[in-house]
């Protein structure tokens, strides 16, 4: 169905809060997943990303969820449907059009970097 989601993941430690973002793209049986330390904004250049293990499809529909074993709180901050414009869709190279409120435009992941630009 080509769904995607951007999740804010807060891990509350004894003295500090670690915040990162998980970006999930639906694949047939699960979701390709990347970790961002900052949200890639439109036309602001390249942002570093880290490939994560694939996540279950259930994360595409969760709005907020408290993880077990003090692993933090996950909250959906953007989501939508994507259009794949690359010849392939895999975890190392991705070129899709996003239609979210925050992430809207041509989104490219190439290795450890991503970029969001205006969709022409």
How should each PLM-predicted stretch be described?
Residues 1-120:
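A charge-rich, low-complexity, intrinsically flexible signal that marks solvent-exposed coils, linkers
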């Amino acid at each position: 169905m080509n769904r995607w989601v951007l999740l804010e993941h807060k891990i509350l430690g004894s003295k500090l809060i670690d915040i990162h973002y998980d970006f999930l793209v639906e694949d047939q049986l699960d979701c390709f997943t990347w970790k961002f330390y900052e949200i890639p904004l439109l036309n602001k250049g390249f942002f570093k990303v880290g490939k994560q293990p694939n996540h279950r499809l259930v994360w595409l529909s969760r709005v907020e969820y408290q993880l077990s074993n003090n692993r933090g709180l996950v909250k959906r901050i953007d989501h939508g449907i994507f259009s794949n414009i690359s010849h392939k869709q895999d975890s190392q190279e991705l070129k899709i059009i996003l239609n979210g409120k925050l992430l809207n435009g041509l989104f490219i992941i190439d290795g450890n970097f991503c970029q969001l630009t205006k969709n022409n």
